[in-house]
From Swiss-Prot:
GO annotation terms (biological process): mRNA processing; RNA splicing; tRNA processing
Keyword match RNA-binding: yes
Gene Ontology molecular function: any one: RNA binding
Protein name as annotated: Maturase K
Compartments reported by the entry: Plastid, Chloroplast
Top-level taxon in the UniProt lineage: Eukaryota
Keywords: Chloroplast, mRNA processing, Plastid, RNA-binding, tRNA processing
Family, per entry: Belongs to the intron maturase 2 family. MatK subfamily.
Known function: Usually encoded in the trnK tRNA gene intron. Probably assists in splicing its own and other chloroplast group II introns.
HAMAP family listed in its UniProt record: MatK (MF_01390)
Keyword tRNA processing carried by entry: yes
């Protein structure tokens, strides 16, 4: 218990930063707007009428914030009818939007200052390639070969938004800022309604991405803090206090309550944390926990996560959100790939003098396959082909210039090949290339009111070069005898590009 409290105070002590006065500074909102324009996911401060950032409206907002009844009037206006009181609703909607964007920027300041205050000798080295999504796959190739079971976890959202506010109390002592956060969340939901609170999370995620991202990252870092502590102390858990992963506030009361509900629970099951080979990966609201051991051990971990979220964050998560898989007998969808660790048999002939032996060796290999059906469904949704995979024209692009049409189709094809370059079998990618190439030809033929055959004969090799991917260009230098689009030598070659930091719905259809 004392060891856990010391670890908690060392890494998560409350910060004595008061950020509320910064909300009265005009440059904060200008910085938030500029940050959204330059970010990887542009987030503009807009009004309900799609009007962009206005310094004049920001000045009016700051003046009104000094008024005593500003917040009360804002709540009243937000509950009024849009048609009957459009002017007041417009200002209320705009002020709420711009305040939430500015608050998200201001709330990140204590966390940034804490990182800057760390001694230089304790700084974690930063590698640019760690930003890439593909940097995960080489790690999985090295680690998953020695593991047995995998838990695929869908990280649950807190049902009640007040939980998100309480999590920030451990890090920020600025009470006015916390009250302001409650005001923003109250703007999106009726706090007395459970169903409305669940809907408000998705509404907040859609309209205020930066604020939602900040709250979600705070929640994720909180639960990963407990998981990291248990992971570091796994070899000492049988001797440590059994309640170290519970919430720090009202610790004794919760311990007694937990002890009454589940007498002797910890003493009997603490041993299942003794696992030195455990690896954790988080991505897109999901997490993967892989380790050695038995299936019974993984079931214990599943029960732990259910009770962990229930008693640490006061909300129930469905056990079906945690899927248990055996790596040798099943595959799992991960960032657009179907991944698995199958066992393959390798027959080796050993010759010793006049005697020869056949040695049967079993090996594991981290296999990644591109799923054909979901990708074709994504192309069908984007109107490049039918549901069965037959290419069709895209009429909405017929008004563009010919080279713009070629560039758009070629860029989609190159992006698909670029992202799925680590696939062990690339037949699916060549099928997608055929669909996009023929869809492009039919779109151009429709624009010029011609046939596909006539149009392709007129363009010739120029049309094909637009779909010649970067990966094939690299291999064509290695194998000079290959010709355009007859090249098939890269089927078994796997390249993980370390410059991919985001993916779209077309590349990642499984989610």
């Amino acid at each position: 218990m004392e060891k856990f409290e010391g670890y908690s105070e060392k890494h998560k002590s409350r910060q004595q930063y008061f950020v509320y006065p910064l909300l009265f500074q005009e440059y904060i909102y200008a910085f938030a707007h500029d940050y959204g324009l330059k970010g990887s996911e542009p987030v503009e401060i807009v009004s309900c009428n799609n009007k962009k950032f206005s310094s004049l409206l920001v000045k009016r907002l700051i003046i009104r914030m000094y008024q005593q009844n500003f917040w009360i009037n804002s709540v009243n206006h937000s509950n009024q009818d849009r048609l009957l009181d459009y002017k007041n609703y417009f200002y209320s909607e705009f002020y709420s939007q711009i305040l939430s964007e500015g608050f998200a920027i201001v709330a990140e300041i204590p966390f940034s200052l804490r990182e800057l205050s760390c001694p230089k000798e304790k700084e974690i080295p930063k590698f640019q390639n760690l930003r890439s999504i593909h940097s995960i796959f080489p790690f999985l190739e090295d680690k998953f070969l020695h593991l047995d079971y995998l838990s695929h976890i869908e990280i649950p959202y807190p049902i009640h938004l007040e939980i998100l506010v309480q999590l920030l109390q451990y890090r920020i002592q600025d009470v006015p800022s916390l009250h302001l956060l409650r005001f923003f969340l109250n703007y999106y939901s009726n706090w007395n309604s459970l169903i409305a609170s669940m809907k408000s999370i998705f509404l907040l995620k859609k309209e205020n991405k930066r604020l939602f991202r900040f709250l979600y990252n705070s929640y994720v870092s909180e639960y990963e803090f407990f998981l990291l502590f248990l992971r570091k102390q796994s070899s000492f858990l049988p001797l440590a206090s059994s309640g170290t992963f519970l919430e720090r506030i009202h610790f004794s009361r919760k311990m007694e309550h937990f002890g009454v509900m589940y007498p002797g629970f910890f003493r009997k099951t603490l041993w299942f944390f003794m696992d030195s080979l455990m690896h954790y990966v988080r991505y897109q609201g999901k997490a993967i926990l892989a380790s050695k051991g038995t299936f019974f051990l993984k079931k214990k971990w599943k029960c732990y996560f259910v009770y962990f979220w229930q008693y640490s964050f006061s909300f129930w998560t469905q056990p079906r959100r945690i899927h248990l898989n055996q790596l040798a007998n099943s595959c799992f969808d991960f960032l657009g790939y179907l991944s698995s660790v199958p066992k393959s048999t390798l027959l080796v002939r050993n010759q010793m003098l006049e005697n020869s032996f056949l040695i049967d060796t079993r090996m594991k290999k981290f296999d990644t396959i591109v799923p054909a059906i979901p990708l074709i469904a994504s192309l069908s949704k984007a109107q490049f082909c039918t549901r069965l995979g037959h290419p069709i024209s895209k009429p909405i692009w017929t008004d563009l210039l010919d080279w713009d049409i070629l560039d758009r189709f070629g860029r989609i094809c190159r992006n698909l090949f670029h992202y799925h370059s680590g696939s062990s079998k690339k037949q699916t990618l060549y099928r997608l290339k055929y669909i996009l190439r023929l869809s492009c030809a039919r779109t151009l033929a429709r624009k010029h009111k011609s046939t596909v055959r006539t149009f392709m004969l007129r363009l010739g090799s120029v049309f094909l070069e637009e779909f010649f991917t970067e990966e094939e260009q690299v291999f064509s230098l290695m194998f000079t005898k290959t010709t355009f689009f007859s090249f098939r030598g890269s089927h078994s070659e796997r390249i993980w590009y370390l410059d991919i930091i985001c993916i779209n719905d077309l590349v990642n259809p499984l989610n």
